[in-house]
């Protein structure tokens, strides 16, 4: 692991070597906006804004991307809910349960699945207000997601409205799937088969499929 310093909390960002090419720009962009971000109480706390930068990228095949953290109790790991109370991760787990037949589980975490990096486009929000920090993170968000898409084969974005123009923001030739948000109305996410489709496409590309059942916690 490497680390860099920034002028505001969290003051130190620890990161895996695979993120090295974007770190100088990240530090510059963060120092420009941090004082505005940190006027608010945030979800997650600043010490957890950049926790996913500790993840390697070269061993990832799929990025599962949400728009921003939970408005309360964000951990810095997208979709993670240690007490398994958040609707989004519960719906994701239900979807994987239907796909895999696994039923006796107590939680689910995308961050423990080989080949997968969960990501949030915006890395924080004001406590209780989803997408409230979008304007501050925008430059950083584009920088980091573009870097991720240089490594993964598939970008799976959860939220048809939030990610309607995501392809226009990407320069890498990554296959992008935009599906329903897990909390979408009328239980639309239940009909979404993107996890299954990703594995079909990986196999067509002669890549190993994702073992989505690996995310279950027992």
UniProtKB/Swiss-Prot annotation:
The protein's matches in InterPro entries, at most eight in alphabetical order, are given as:
Ura-DNA_Glyclase_AS, Uracil-DNA_glycosylase-like_sf
Q: Does the keyword Membrane apply?
A: no
Q: Which CDD domains match?
A: UDG_F1_VAVC_D4-like
Asked if the record carries the keyword DNA-binding, the reply is yes
Look up the EC number in the record and give it: 3.2.2.27
Keywords assigned: DNA damage, DNA repair, DNA-binding, Hydrolase
Q: Which GO terms describe its biological process?
A: DNA repair
Disulfide linkage: none
- Active-site residues (renumbered): 68 (proton acceptor)
Q: Which reaction does it catalyse?
A: Hydrolyzes single-stranded DNA or mismatched double-stranded DNA and polynucleotides, releasing free uracil
What is the uppermost EC class here? Answer: hydrolase
Highest taxon, organism lineage: Viruses
One GO molecular function term of this record is:
uracil DNA N-glycosylase activity
Q: How does it assemble?
A: Homodimer. Interacts with protein OPG148. Component of the Uracil-DNA glycosylase(UDG)-OPG148-polymerase complex; OPG148 and UDG form a heterodimeric processivity factor that associates with OPG71 to form the processive polymerase holoenzyme.
Similarity annotation = Belongs to the uracil-DNA glycosylase (UDG) superfamily. UNG family.
Q: What does this protein do?
A: Plays an essential role in viral replication as a component of the DNA polymerase processivity factor. Excises uracil residues from the DNA which can arise as a result of misincorporation of dUMP residues by DNA polymerase or due to deamination of cytosine.
UniProt-recorded name of the protein: Uracil-DNA glycosylase
């Amino acid at each position: 692991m490497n680390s860099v310093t920034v002028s505001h909390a969290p003051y130190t960002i620890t990161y895996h070597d695979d993120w090295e090419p974007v770190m100088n720009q990240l530090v510059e962009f963060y120092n420009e906006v941090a004082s505005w971000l940190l006027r608010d109480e945030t979800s997650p706390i600043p010490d957890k804004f950049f926790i996913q930068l500790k993840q390697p990228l070269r061993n990832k095949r799929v990025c599962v991307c949400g728009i921003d953290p939970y408005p309360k109790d964000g951990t810095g790991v997208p979709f993670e809910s240690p007490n398994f109370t958040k609707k989004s991760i519960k719906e994701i787990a239900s979807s994987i349960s239907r796909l895999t037949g696994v039923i006796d589980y107590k939680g689910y975490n995308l961050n423990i699945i080989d080949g997968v990096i969960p990501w949030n486009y915006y890395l924080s929000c004001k406590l209780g207000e989803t997408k409230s920090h979008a304007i501050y993170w925008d430059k950083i968000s584009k920088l980091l997601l573009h870097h991720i898409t240089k490594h993964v084969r598939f970008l799976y974005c959860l939220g048809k409205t939030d990610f309607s123009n995501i392809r226009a923001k990407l320069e890498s030739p990554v296959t992008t799937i935009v599906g329903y948000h897990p909390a979408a109305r009328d239980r639309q996410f239940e009909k979404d088969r993107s996890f299954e489709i990703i594995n079909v496409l990986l196999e067509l590309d002669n890549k190993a499929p994702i073992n989505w059942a690996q995310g279950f916690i027992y």
